[in-house]
Regions:
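Hydrophobic alpha-helical segments, chiefly the membrane-spanning helices
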Residues: 1-312
Length: 312
């Protein structure tokens, strides 16, 4: 029954998260907010809403291992699993990637995150530091986007969930379903994951780093698989880099304002360094244009399997 509840929690998070994004995007556009701002803020935060609610729920329930494990584990899974699986399906030519600056931000933010973790917990001031760093990244991205002179109509066509014809009652319904479903799904998932940890005699940290992290990374995996099939390497890399940025700064930043998140010793001695290492592993693909094909897919998945084995 616990596994069924875990699946229910994941499904609720994904579906409710999609409802929230669609509702928030279309409401913002109705209010006259430019598509560029909606894309860089509301969509970015909205697609990370499942991870955010899981982190907040875990922190308030005193299971910080799940909160931290979800974020750190998701960042590891995003590189090794979310890039590894699509690479088996279709070779991605990463030459001329537009993700170089975002990659540098991601690595820099990872170093900042590790430094803050050595304070022993993520509380109010650590959360504010992370959110300030995220604001700088968003500001830089917005400046770059404006320099590209892309019209608002073009942005609207590419904007996830945008539907100018959507009636107001549907917009409000999507918002309501998202706001109800997200905390409900997070509550079910955290409770079920904690129960699984107790049943198997493992720590909530291990469950957060594996089961919860993989589950909350499934939407990114689906998006990246589609990008690989369409030969959109930039979309695949940008999806992973953007998700990792928001996981570190947005999710832990906001969650730590709600409740302190303690950092278990194993994060400081192992998992955070694995996260940084696999992030740096993306450098040849981003800067040198290495082709991400089947051989590299096998290597990435083997590394991920090895990492999971070391946790068990």
């Amino acid at each position: 029954m616990t596994w069924v509840l875990t699946a229910v929690g994941f499904v609720l998070l994904v579906v409710a998260g999609d409802f929230l994004v669609r509702g928030a995007v279309n409401l913002s556009l109705r209010l006259g907010i430019p598509a560029l701002i909606v894309s860089l803020t509301i969509v970015a935060f909205g697609t990370s809403a499942p991870e955010l609610l899981v982190a907040i729920q875990a922190a308030t329930q005193g299971v910080s291992g799940i909160a931290m494990g979800n974020v750190v584990g998701s960042n590891i899974a995003n590189v090794l699993l979310v890039l590894g699986v699509p690479a088996l399906i279709s070779t991605m030519d990463t030459g001329g990637s537009d993700s170089r600056k975002s990659f540098v931000f991601m690595v820099g933010l990872s170093v900042l995150f590790i430094a803050l973790a050595f304070t022993g917990q993520f509380g109010l001031w650590q959360g504010l530091v992370l959110l300030a760093a995220l604001a700088l990244v968003l500001g830089e991205n917005m400046y770059d986007a404006r320099r590209q002179m892309q019209s608002d109509d073009e942005l609207l066509d590419d904007l996830e969930g945008a539907d100018p014809a959507l009636p107001m009652w549907k917009i409000l319904l999507f918002l309501l379903l998202g706001l109800i479903g997200l905390p409900l799904g997070a509550n079910i998932l955290v409770d079920a994951a904690s129960e699984i940890a107790r049943n198997f005699g493992v720590s909530d940290t291990v469950i957060g780093l594996t089961l919860v992290a993989i589950g909350t990374s499934l939407p990114e995996l689906a998006t990246t698989v589609m990008a690989a099939i369409r030969k959109q390497a930039d979309v695949a890399l940008g999806n992973v880099i953007g998700s990792n940025l928001f996981n570190l700064a947005g999710i832990i930043g906001v969650a730590s304002l709600v409740a302190p998140i303690s950092v278990a010793p194993e994060f400081l001695t192992y998992d955070l360094w694995v996260m940084l290492g696999v992030s740096v592993l993306m450098a040849p693909f981003v800067f040198l244009g290495w082709r991400l094909g089947r051989r590299w897919g096998i290597v990435l998945l083997a590394l991920y399997a090895s990492y999971v084995v070391t946790l068990l």
